[in-house]
């Protein structure tokens, strides 16, 4: 009789994943809170819709810098210490957002948040996946990423109402809490055993991901990540504004985004099990194709029908964003240990610029067709391209060619 999967994980491995997961919970909370109060900030600071969209996504500009730096440092000095520093950085950036007095100050603060959150992802994802048994790494990947959804749900439940009573500035001060987590990680969490075993081997330089034999695989992993962010971030970032602009009140928006967060949370964990069962690539394609069932009617339903919108949102996030839980494992398979932090941090976060470009593109298109239709168009386009890339296993074929050379 086969041993249950959870019995194959020892206490240090559980503690490693839990500490990385907590960091990602606060990451999701700190990063997503601005999207729930962006309409309040917009009115208070007197900024335009396109400026508000850019503020909401400026953290993506910082992500390749933060991810590359922290990833490279994690390859050199260890996953755990650099994860601690990354958590500290995004917490400080969030807290400083509360004292911003204009568009430019807020943009700088969000840039700092982007540096920290991208670094946290680079360190935490390699740390979590490396710490678990090979046959359970899709689950480790999914459990880790589910933390972002938990943080998002908490933000959706707390921040809108808190901001209405105490102001949007005080909302950002809550984002300083993760600093306390750093102290616990320093005391309790173990280092990645896989990194410890590999740390005395030759190290790669910062430019190694852009040189043979890694260049081609870096480029295709970048394209996959760019399309993934393009497929799910327009709805994540702009849906609250879409609902608010159509007269939906704050309580209903908070409820709907909580439902969306629950969809992402359960979908992330579900596809972690599916990934270990049928493989990461097949799980990707199944999730994306299924997402069209829920996406197609979403923006053509009356905003007054909140129950049906909630159902579609849950299903869309379960599928379209649920597969994001497999990304750390997906990247893990294409980079060696000595380059994994850098590869994850730099290439994944370069791809994350899709999360900046797609909402801006959707906002631009909305000037012609309305925000609902533009969100639909952009999401379908990026999802279709992602299905083609992963469905035909383009990354796997390129990887085999690069290894063979």
From Swiss-Prot:
TM region(s), chain numbering: 21-41, 54-74, 81-101, 103-123, 140-160, 165-185, 215-235, 251-271, 283-303, 308-328, 345-365, 372-392
Cytoplasmic side: 1-20, 75-80, 124-139, 186-214, 272-282, 329-344, 393-405
Subcellular location: Cell inner membrane
Stretches assigned to the Periplasmic side: 42-53, 102, 161-164, 236-250, 304-307, 366-371
Expression triggers: Negatively regulated by the transcriptional repressor NanR. Induced by N-acetylneuraminate, via inactivation of NanR.
GO CC term, one of those recorded: plasma membrane
Membrane-topology descriptor: Multi-pass membrane protein
Mutant phenotype after disruption: Inactivation of the gene in NanR-deficient cells prevents the growth on 2,7-AN and 2,3-EN. Deletion of the gene in strain BW25113 results in loss of growth on 2,7-AN but not on Neu5Ac.
UniProt keyword RNA-binding present: no
Note: Bell et al. show that this transporter allows the growth of E.coli strain BW25113 on 2,7-AN as a sole carbon source. However, Kentache et al. show that it allows the growth of E.coli on 2,7-AN and 2,3-EN, which are produced during the degradation of sialoconjugates by sialidases from other bacteria, provided the repressor NanR has been inactivated.
This protein's name: Sialic acid transporter NanX
Gene symbol of the encoding locus: nanX
